[in-house]
Amino acid sequence: MKPSDMRQLKAEDFQKEIDSRKKELMELRFQAAMGNLAQPHRVTQLRREVAQLNTIRGEQRAGEQK
């Protein structure tokens, strides 16, 4: 998901998106530990998306407080 698409999300959808990505990340880490990870680049991609979602959510909260 692109950051421009992330900015279009509603406030309640942010946590759902973050939770789903963290769950997938946990599953991929488990696969990596077992030695059968098919897409190792996906771990980095998910970590980046979670960070972007958290950053955008923080920006929106800061904008609401002003």
From Swiss-Prot:
GO molecular function: structural constituent of ribosome
Pfam families, sorted: Ribosomal_L29
Keywords: Ribonucleoprotein, Ribosomal protein
Gene Ontology CC annotation, any one: cytosolic large ribosomal subunit
Keyword Endoplasmic reticulum among UniProt keywords: no
Gene Ontology terms describing biological process: translation
HAMAP family attached to this UniProt entry: Ribosomal_uL29
Similarity annotation: Belongs to the universal ribosomal protein uL29 family.
Protein name: Large ribosomal subunit protein uL29
